[in-house]
């Protein structure tokens, strides 16, 4: 059984898919759950938000890995969290009977990094979508993105041009890396390091398209 704590927002009826939200640095599993009702107002998705496994000296909340340099996670803590999240996702798919092809991995900041890592890792199954707010595709030892087998994966990237924490160039690099192989939708606003409400209507529309419809439609 995975050791990661989590919170869950159940669907109103039989879910059409699964949305896993990974919080940012220094918060916890409660932080992104309010986005569930924004992105899925009809409560058609099972929504789960795990808690990062690390606490860092001098920081509040929880973290996914140590940060020696933006863009380059600490290899040791990254690898441990990658393994823990892999186990968490696998157990969640077994419990909910919703597979990776019905799953959107989402996150903010450090949580986006882990969504990219688990969604693009060569030893992990391809998800239906990746919802990426203000993050980056990591550069880290022993991890490389595998793109050619993920051409059906939808990616939504949103990044603020005035982000002082993770500069907008990281969002642009992710777009450049992914758009040749995956279905990428990209947005920028003048926001700093937060989820700009201006992104949300487009994200809602994207999620309806990315999350599969059990009736056989496009979702």
Language model: regions and residue ranges:
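Short alpha-helix in the alpha/beta-hydrolase fold that links the catalytic acid
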Residues: 32-35, 143-144, 167-177
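Short beta-strand immediately N-terminal to the catalytic nucleophile in serine-hydrolase-like folds
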Residues: 105-107, 133
């Amino acid at each position: 059984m995975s050791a990661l704590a989590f919170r869950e927002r159940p669907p109103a009826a039989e879910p059409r898919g699964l949305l896993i939200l990974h919080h940012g640095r220094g918060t916890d599993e409660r932080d992104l759950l309010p986005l569930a009702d924004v992105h899925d107002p009809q409560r058609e998705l099972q929504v789960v938000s795990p808690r990062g496994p690390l606490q860092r000296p001098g920081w509040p909340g929880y973290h996914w890995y140590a940060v020696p340099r933006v863009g380059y996670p600490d290899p040791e803590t990254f690898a441990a969290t990658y393994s823990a999240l892999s186990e968490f996702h696998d157990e969640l798919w077994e419990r909910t009977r919703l597979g990776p092809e019905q799953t959107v991995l989402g996150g903010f900041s450090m949580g986006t990094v882990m969504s990219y890592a688990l969604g693009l890792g060569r030893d992990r199954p391809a998800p239906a979508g990746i919802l990426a707010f203000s993050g980056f595709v990591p550069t880290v030892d022993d991890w490389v993105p595998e793109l050619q087998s993920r051409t059906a994966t939808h990616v939504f990237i949103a990044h603020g041009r005035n982000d002082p924490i993770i500069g907008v160039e990281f969002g642009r690099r992710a777009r450049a890396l992914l758009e040749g192989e995956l279905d990428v939708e990209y947005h920028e606003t003048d926001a700093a390091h937060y989820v700009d409400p201006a992104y949300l209507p487009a994200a809602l529309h994207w999620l309806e398209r990315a999350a599969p419809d059990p009736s056989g439609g496009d979702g």
